[in-house]
């Protein structure tokens, strides 16, 4: 690679724009295990036919992953380092928003249509705005129809937005939380947007005491309507990643390894219907064109102690794994998959990136961020 950034109408050549090797090497050395990636034979072709790529996060490895394929260089897994990456979303403008440790980061694609990085990547997400929030334990994130970032603070049990002056500005508290306080009481985690507004959240319990949710992991989980404060579904095990798709509310019943749909026959509380079992603790869900992209994680302490997932895995004679499964919603079958083996055992969130088949992202504060310079086409008069 060249030491000088060069840009043409078609291609930008940038120095060391893929820190994958260094990140993977550090993880492997620290754990004493090799990291391996595998995928189903049809995954890359499926993404290409859909005109999309995948982004997913692992706070355990400190990595933002982007999976796609180049027409000339084949499948590509680009990995960029980020402090504790958690929830991510792609908004209507195509920008990527990420909750990451003590900050919320807005990435923008800096390439023009037809441009590529190093003849491979057709989108390059640069961290353009970094809001320092402090440690709020940010989880799911979305952007409303006014361009306002809305994210879940598990530590403060609320939906919040960024503030120019303060660490955060609270937006909404669940009705069972009595006060805004820095205690993770119910483990609020998931956020579903609908029509550009916060619509539903998931919580592990309705507990209103510090760490109360830990004793309610099996069966204490709820889905709450943000607009009314109603509990629309309960009895879940550590629910995560609520998402709206074609008028239906889908949720990952993580502690049972289930993709479920919430059914409401009228006003008031509904029920959840399991549609698919996946062998892992489920977090990260994106739905598109009749398919669900589901993130799977292995247990943190060898077993999913106290969760239905342990029994389900034993019953199906299955081992948990880390990766992404593509589920056909019409049949419930897993039609494609991507798997990670080795020291990376946990994912948090994933998103489908439409319109780009081989994206990459730049790590904040990295040499790559310093080297990749772009500018507007003309001076503003």
Predicted feature descriptions by range:
Residues 39-51, 105-115, 201-218, 295-319, ...:
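Short, conserved, GDST-rich strand-edge loop motifs in beta-rich repeat architectures
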Residues 36-50, 82-93, 131-148, 177-199, ...:
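Beta-rich, blade/repeat-based domains predominating
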Residues 73-142, 286:
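Blade-loop segments of beta-propeller domains
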Residues 73-79, 126-131, 169-181, 228-234, ...:
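A short beta-strand motif characteristic of beta-propeller blades
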Residues 38-42, 236-265, 270-329:
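Loop/turn-rich, solvent-exposed surfaces of beta-rich toroidal or solenoidal domains
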Residues 63, 103-105, 158-160, 219-222, ...:
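A short loop-to-beta-strand structural motif that recurs across blades of beta-propeller domains
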Residues 56-59, 91, 97-103, 143, ...:
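Conserved beta-strand positions in repeat-built beta-propeller and related beta-rich domains
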Residues 320-325, 329-381:
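Blade-level signature of beta-propeller repeat domains, shared across WD40, Kelch, NHL, RCC1
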């Amino acid at each position: 690679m060249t030491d000088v950034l060069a840009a043409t109408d078609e291609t930008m050549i940038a120095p060391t724009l893929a820190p994958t090797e260094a990140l993977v090497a550090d993880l492997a050395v620290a754990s004493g295990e090799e990291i391996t990636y595998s995928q189903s034979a049809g995954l890359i072709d499926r993404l290409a036919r859909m005109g999309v790529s995948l982004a997913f996060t692992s706070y355990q490895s400190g990595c933002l992953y982007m999976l796609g394929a180049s027409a000339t260089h084949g499948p590509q897994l680009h990995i960029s380092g980020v402090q504790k990456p958690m929830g991510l979303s792609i908004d209507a403008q195509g920008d990527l928003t990420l909750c990451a440790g003590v900050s919320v980061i807005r990435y923008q694609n800096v390439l023009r249509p037809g441009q590529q990085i190093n003849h491979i990547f057709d989108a390059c997400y640069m961290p353009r705005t970094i809001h320092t929030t402090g440690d709020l334990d940010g989880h799911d994130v979305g952007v409303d129809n006014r361009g306002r970032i809305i994210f879940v603070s598990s530590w403060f049990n609320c939906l919040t937005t960024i503030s120019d002056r303060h660490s955060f500005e609270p937006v909404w508290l669940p009705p069972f939380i009595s006060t805004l306080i820095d205690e993770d009481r119910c483990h609020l985690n998931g956020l579903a947007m609908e029509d550009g507004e916060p619509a539903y959240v998931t919580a592990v319990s309705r507990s209103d005491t510090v760490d109360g949710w830990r004793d309610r992991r099996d069966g204490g989980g709820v889905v709450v309507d943000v607009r009314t404060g109603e509990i629309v579904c309960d009895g879940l095990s550590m629910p995560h990643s609520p998402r709206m798709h074609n008028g239906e509310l889908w949720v990952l019943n993580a502690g049972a390894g289930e993709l479920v749909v919430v059914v409401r026959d009228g006003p008031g509380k509904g029920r959840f219907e399991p549609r698919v079992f996946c062998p892992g603790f489920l977090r990260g869900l994106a739905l598109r064109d009749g398919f669900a992209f589901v993130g799977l994680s292995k247990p943190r302490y060898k077993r999913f102690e106290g969760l239905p997932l342990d029994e389900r895995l034993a019953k199906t004679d299955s081992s948990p794994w880390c990766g992404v499964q593509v589920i056909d919603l019409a049949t419930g079958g897993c039609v494609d998959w991507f798997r990670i083996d080795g020291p990376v055992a946990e994912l948090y969130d994933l998103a489908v990136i439409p319109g780009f088949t081989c994206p990459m992202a730049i790590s904040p504060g990295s040499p790559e961020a310093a080297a990749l310079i772009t500018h507007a086409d003309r001076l503003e008069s």
